[in-house]
A protein has these predicted regions:
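His/acidic/aromatic-lined binding-pocket segments of jelly-roll/cupin-type domains
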Residues: 54, 60, 70-73, 77-82, ...
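Short acidic-glycine-tyrosine-enriched beta hairpin
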Residues: 25-26, 79, 86, 93-111
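A short, N-terminal "cap"/entry segment at the start of jelly-roll beta-barrel domains
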Residues: 1-55, 147-174
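Conserved short histidine dyad/triad with adjacent acidic residue
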Residues: 40-47, 58-73
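Hydrophobic small-molecule pocket/channel-lining residues, especially in calycin-type beta-barrels
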Residues: 66, 74, 87, 105, ...
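A contiguous, mid-protein "functional segment" used to position or interact
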Residues: 120-161
């Protein structure tokens, strides 16, 4: 017999995975959505809907140097894989310079940041495992537009916290 004072059990949601494989063309998004974030294009390649929330993968094309603030995810691991350009990635106390073909891994709860440090266009794959609410995070971030630049500390801190992340410090300096 169930205790009437006990908390309700969490409902388990089972989503249908894609029944077949799929192709996402170069420079295209899985759902043809355009996410522009701080001058870069973010294309979703594998969605949380494709993997029952197990992971999501983004292809980010950046046109200017820089990257996000030092932060940590409470529930997601993050993997970085460089396709074009040179990137600096900090994970905990280690800093790595990544070139095309190099990758770095940031376990959940470990502070990390990345920045494009080369001239011209750069391209990096970002994988989040599990997906969590990263897709919603990037959609909201892209909608913020100028608000990011007008009051970045307040706007980004709130957005990060709403999606299980914490801003720890400033973006990487190089």
């Amino acid at each position: 017999m169930k205790n009437p004072d006990s908390k309700p059990e969490a409902e388990v949601i089972h989503r249908e995975r894609a029944g077949e494989g799929f192709l996402v063309a170069a420079q295209k998004d899985r759902y043809s959505q355009e996410l522009l974030i701080m001058g870069g294009q973010l294309n979703l390649k594998i969605s949380e809907r494709d993997t029952d929330g197990a992971l999501c993968v983004y292809d980010a094309t950046l046109v200017s140097k820089g990257g996000p603030a030092l932060h940590r995810h409470q529930a997601q691991d993050e993997w970085f894989y460089v396709i074009r350009g040179e990137f600096m990635v900090r994970v905990g106390g280690d800093t790595f310079n990544l070139h095309p073909g190099d990758s770095a891994f940031a376990p959940r709860k470990v502070p990390h940041a990345y920045a494009m440090i080369s001239e011209g266009e750069g391209q990096i794959l970002l994988l989040y495992q599990p997906a969590g609410s990263m897709e919603e995070f990037f959609h909201q971030l892209s909608k913020m537009g100028k608000e990011i630049f007008e009051n970045p500390q307040v706007a980004l801190k709130r957005l990060f916290e709403e999606h299980g992340m914490e801003v720890i410090g400033a973006p990487l300096k190089f």
